[in-house]
Structure formats: C-alpha cells, structure tokens
C-alpha cells in the first residue's frame, strides 16, 4: 500500500470516528432563557391567603405572569397541610426539587422539625411528596434554601432555626430523602432569618436578614463550609419591614437582582435592587416601573428555565383570564374600583380583586376594548361626565360607547399602553388626583397620567 493511500485511509477513518462521536454524544443542556417563581400568597387582611405552591413565569425575570389563575399547583397532604417559603432547586441531573416550610398560616409559635419536599422533572407534575425531618430541636424549620456543594458531592439544605438564638442550620443530602445531622451553618453573633445561598463560580453567597436591625445583608465564602461566611455588604431595606432576600443571577450572566419581601407598613409587597457586580457593595434600588411581582406573592424563590420548560408550564397551567393596569408615573399604583368609582391605589390592598379586569372586545366596537370587573361581573369601566365609574351594562348604545376604548401605544412609553375613548376620540383614560377620567392630552404630565402597563 502506498504511503499516500495509507494516509488517505487514515484520515477517512479519523473522520468517521469523529462523526460517530458527534452523533452519539449526549445533547447539550438547553440554555435557560426564562424564569419561574415559586411562592405562596397573602394579602393585607388575609383575603388572598393561600398556603399551597404557586408558580409564575417571566421572560425577563422582572415582570411576572401567575399560572393556574394564581391558584396552587400542588398542596401538602401531610403535616400542617400548608406551606410557606417554597424553594425550587434545579439539581445536577437537570430535574427539580421543591422544599418548603411546613406551616399552614401565620402561627409562628409552632415548633416543627420537618420540611415539605416534592420532586419534579418539569414543574408540570410533582411526585414523591414527603416530609423530611431536619433536626430534633424544640424549634421551627423555616425558609429552606439549597445548593450543590461540589467539594462534598452533596447538596446543602440551609434553614432558619433557633438553638438559643436565631441561626441558620445545614443538613447535607444526596437524594433529599436521607439527610445528615443538622449543624450550625451561620451564626454571626446576632440573630438572623431567611437565608438564601447562591453559588457563583468558586464563591458562595449567603443573603440574610439581620433581626437586630431589620436590614438585609450579603455574606460570602470561598468554600461554602459551615461558619465560613463573612458579611461584605451594607444593610438594605425598602419599606419599613422587610425579609426573605432572593438573590438572582440573570440568564445572560451579565447582572444580578436582589428581591426583598416587605411586610410593613402593609403586608405583601416586593421590592428589588440590581447590580452588575454581586461581589461588590453596589446594589441600586430599582424603579417599580421595571418590575411587577406575581399577584399576592410572598416569600418565594426564582429559578432559570428553558424556553421549552416555559412553554410547557404555560401549556400545562394556563395564563390568567384577567389583567391589571399599572400606572406609569405612579408604578406602585394599579387601576381599581372603589365605591363604584375608577381610581389608582397603591398595591397591595384588599379586596385585591378590585384591580382585576377582563379586557374584552369593545362593547361598541370589537376592535376596541372594554374592562369588565372580575368581582362585579356585568359591570364595566365607563365614563360619565368624563369621570370613570364602574356601572352595570344596561345594553344601551350610550353605555356601550362610554365603555369602549381603543388601545394604542403608550403616550409616554410605546412599550406600555394608552386607551383612547371611543365616543370622545380626543380624550384618553388618565388619572388625576388618583381618580380616573377621560381628558384631552397635551402636556408631558397628561401623557404620563394616561400611560399604563397591561400586566397580570
């Protein structure tokens, strides 16, 4: 055989082997391009409390859409029959585990050594429900978070407990069924609550609440080992009472968000910060225009998901059949009815259903829209003497015209929406002194007052 022919055969054989290797190689894991939020719900007077597992999805990690009509997708069947503080972890094999506090309601004096646990391949189905005992102390087991510890080849489950003071405990596990004995994970010399552990490369970050001053802080460690963390940030808070920090890296890997659950001056409000450098003390308060938490969401967790998983969740659980309208220039306020008048009020409030609308084809022109109340079906937002009221549809031509609007690009932000009156086409839906009306629009303030985000 000539050297040239031998070389040709050798190259052909190598090419074939490479081709076979490529064909038989396992497919790479799809990149995360969306997010899922796990939470339970409460409202200021308890009207919206539900202690099952709720899910919401988001394309951008900031503006959220509740699934399953904001009803729970699964509820505990043992222990207290309720949960708080659900945490979603994507495991090393790509599947999910869900952990949650075993507490149905707000009796925080209950002692409970257990956590709820579910397995899921896709968050469309939940299997293997169980409770796992974390310790035998006469105390609680609150706010679980979990992470992969590569040096141990195990997962760490961190939670709030009290061993004479409020500390974080940790148990290690390979299967979320059998756990090691609990040990103190973080006890910085002052009481702490609600830890969240995130691993970024070789650095472990632990965000927590300092119960002595009520502020949120970040600590870090190069090993993630128990009692190895050092606090590196200044204290953070929005509102007057905040807990449950959630540290989230965006899917692009270019930045971070920190969420905090505010319970005072009114229960059930989320605030957020952003940073391009989680390792620095450089958190910036985000304008509430930039984010919309899930309706009534409390102390939860956020995980990245793929486009396929996002579509699967929407297909399985469905999108809301209602909308909300968020004010552009008062982004803590939402359109609602009160005493049959239209207005914008700071969220959260009860009845929370006052802000939910079915945006239906316009009563006078199907190319427009009308807003039917969710909790007063048959009543619509309509103008009367240019003021917006919630009135029953009397099926007259006048009512249908008064209750119809054309949705157009937002007058102050084209990514948002404005609503032009059907029968007074020079006037737009806007707020003035927090009351809704239709007015001609001429100034920058007018345009801002007439711009809303259609959200859920």
Where are these regions (language model features)?
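General secondary-structure propensity
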Residues: 16-17, 45, 431
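Serine/proline-rich low-complexity intrinsically disordered segments, especially terminal tails, linkers
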Residues: 4, 14, 60, 122, ...
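Secretory targeting and sorting signals
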Residues: 1-30
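Composition- and surface-driven signal marking solvent-exposed, interaction-prone regions
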Residues: 9, 288-289, 441
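Carbohydrate-active catalytic/glycan-binding domains of CAZyme proteins
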Residues: 31-321, 404, 414
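Lectin-like carbohydrate-binding module/patch detector with strong preference for beta-trefoil
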Residues: 318-456
């Amino acid at each position: 055989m000539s050297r040239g022919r031998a070389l040709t055969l050798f190259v052909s054989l190598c090419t074939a082997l490479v081709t076979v290797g490529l064909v038989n190689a396992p497919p790479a894991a799809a990149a995360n391009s969306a997010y899922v939020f796990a939470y339970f719900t409460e409202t200021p007077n308890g009207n919206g409390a539900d202690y099952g597992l709720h899910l919401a999805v988001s394309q951008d990690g900031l503006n959220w859409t509740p699934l399953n009509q904001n009803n729970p997708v699964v509820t505990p069947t043992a222990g207290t029959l309720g949960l708080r503080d659900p945490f979603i972890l994507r495991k090393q094999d790509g599947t999910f585990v869900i952990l949650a506090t075993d507490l149905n309601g707000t009796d925080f004096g209950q002692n409970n050594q257990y956590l709820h646990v579910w397995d899921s391949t896709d968050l469309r189905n939940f299997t293997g429900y169980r409770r796992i005992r974390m310790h035998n102390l006469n105390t609680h087991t609150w706010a679980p978070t979990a992470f992969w510890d590569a040096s141990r080849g195990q997962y760490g489950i961190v939670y709030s407990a009290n061993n004479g003071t409020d500390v974080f405990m940790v148990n290690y596990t390979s299967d979320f069924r059998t756990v090691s004995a609990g040990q103190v994970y973080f006890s910085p010399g002052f009481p702490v609550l609600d830890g969240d552990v995130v691993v970024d490369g070789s650095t472990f970050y632990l965000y927590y609440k300092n119960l002595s001053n009520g502020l949120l802080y970040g600590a870090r460690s190069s090993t993630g080992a128990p009692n190895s963390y050092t606090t590196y940030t200044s204290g953070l808070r929005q509102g007057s009472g905040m807990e449950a920090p959630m540290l989230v890296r965006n899917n692009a890997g270019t930045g971070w968000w920190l969420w905090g659950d505010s319970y005072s001056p009114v229960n059930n409000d989320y605030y957020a910060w952003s940073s391009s450098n989680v390792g620095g003390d450089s958190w910036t308060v985000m304008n509430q225009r930039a984010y919309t938490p899930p309706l009534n969401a409390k102390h939860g967790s956020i995980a990245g998901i793929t486009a396929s998983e996002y579509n699967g969740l929407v297909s399985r659980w469905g999108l809301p059949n209602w909308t909300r309208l968020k004010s552009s220039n008062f982004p803590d306020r939402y359109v609602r009815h009160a005493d049959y008048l239209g207005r914008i009020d700071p969220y959260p409030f009860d009845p929370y259903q006052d802000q939910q609308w079915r945006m239906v084809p316009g009563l006078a022109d199907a190319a427009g829209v009308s807003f039917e109340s969710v909790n007063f079906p048959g009543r619509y937002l309509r103008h009367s003497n240019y003021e917006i009221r919630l009135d029953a549809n009397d099926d007259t031509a006048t009512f249908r015209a008064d209750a119809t609007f054309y949705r157009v690009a937002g007058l102050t932000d084209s990514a948002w929406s404005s609503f032009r009156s059907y029968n007074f086409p020079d006037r737009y839906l806007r707020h003035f002194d927090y009351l809704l009306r239709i007015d001609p629009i001429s100034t920058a303030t007018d345009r801002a007052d007439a711009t809303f985000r259609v959200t859920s």
